[in-house]
Amino acid sequence: MEGPPLSPAPADNVTLNVSCGRPATLFDWADHRLISLLALAFLNLMVVAGNLLVVMAVFVHSKLRTVTNLFIVSLACADLLVGMLVLPFSATLEVLDVWLYGDVWCSVWLAVDVWMCTSSILNLCAISLDRYLAVSQPISYPSLMSTRRAKQLIAAVWVLSFVICFPPLVGWNDRPGTLIGSRGSSACRLTCELTNERGYVIYSALGSFFLPSTVMLFFYGRIYRTAVSTTRAIAQGFRTTKEDEEGRLTLRIHRGRSVTQRAEQAAAGGARAHGQVRLTLSEPGARRQNKPSFVVHCREDSRAKNQYEIYTVVEGDSRPGRRVPQPQRPAKKLSSASQSSEDDSRPPRFISRVSRRNVRHQARRFRMETKAAKTVGIIVGLFILCWLPFFVCYLVRGFCADCVPPLLFSVFFWLGYCNSAVNPCVYALCSRDFRFAFSSILCKCVCRRGAMERRFRRTLLVGNRSQTEEDCEVAD
């Protein structure tokens, strides 16, 4: 069904001829309609401009090209498509209270609406998984969530979102069309609404919101537990590194003041840095005097970057103060010590690998990952806050069509759309990198516009001078 033509209208109202008994008066230009139109147009502009700025920031600034920001770009693309393909038609329908674009585009528009909103929340699920891996497994995170796997996960998100929005296009709906009323009546009008078919309402509500929200809350619960335990471990100075049925292995780190001072002096003077770190391995149930304990002396060679000369002083050895030299090797993460002694109570003879990064660096990295998780947590919380009222009403309306007032449903409907404009604001407030990228892009645009205006004015000025000189020559 093609969009019906608009007929000439008086100044105070608009009419639409839909081949009914007589033209139906749709609305008059009341103040509240004009205010609604301006507000919805401003919201649409915010959605498009904000999310376009996010995409540009990630692609322009190399510092923002991280795995996590791939999911952020995917989320911004979904919100950007909402602003470009959904909101203009939603605003028209909201203000005019009539659908002007035909039955085919009505079906496509509804499907795109569900597709983009579903992809937004599934992208948030992927982001919560990414943050959980980054906080809980920081060492193996780069291999677990590589760029290739992130792109595969993003593709799966968009395909699954399309699976949820596709059924109404092939007939799983109860929508008879865009025409309400009979053509012989003077009250008939065109509309485009979501289906109330109970089966699809349950299917789409669970797949688009409730199940993904449960998954996100689960991951953020685990992130919170991991953050609390890691913060406590940093404060107490030990960390459980292995746990099984036989027991757990605890690594205690004693870092003296002299180690840091010597390292800083060596870094400033370019000399060799000598450091000492005491490590204690303990198991539950073992007596205190049997704890394996040893001291690692690290000497950094300034001539060979990232190289350590390692000596291990074994406490409790029959030859006190014995040094076991180890060859120089690139600094790597701390691994379990080799133990070749027949007695389990004897300390390890050497450490196979010693990390160059100290506890302070690990704590700083953990704080960065936790801050990123907090930012994404705010985004998830705002998403649930904006969309939960709508999906509750949407689910209730599938069982009782008259139980939800149209005005309330419309308010919650647009509250969900507001979420697409909120995310860029969260990035600007919570992320220094995004804030810097936004400001630099906007400054470039403003400066470029100013340069173009100055060039245009200069061209006009030169042209006016030339014209004046020609006029003077003619007069002479």
From Swiss-Prot:
Q: Which UniProt keywords apply?
A: Cell membrane, Disulfide bond, G-protein coupled receptor, Glycoprotein, Membrane, Receptor, Transducer, Transmembrane, Transmembrane helix
According to UniProt, the name of this protein is: Probable G-protein coupled receptor No9
The record lists the organism as Amphibalanus amphitrite (Striped barnacle)
Cytoplasmic compartment segments? 61-69, 128-152, 222-375, 431-476
Which residues are marked as site: Implicated in ligand binding? D113, S208
- Give the region (Disordered) as residue ranges: 266-293, 317-351
| Glycosylation sites recorded in the entry for this protein | N13, N17
- What job does the chain carry out? Orphan G-protein coupled receptor.
Give the Gene Ontology MF terms in alphabetical order: adrenergic receptor activity
State any GO CC term. plasma membrane
Q: Say if the entry is tagged with keyword Glycoprotein.
A: yes
Entry keyword Lyase: no
Cellular location of this protein? Cell membrane
* Positions in the Extracellular compartment: 1-36, 94-103, 173-200, 397-406
Report the family membership.
Belongs to the G-protein coupled receptor 1 family.
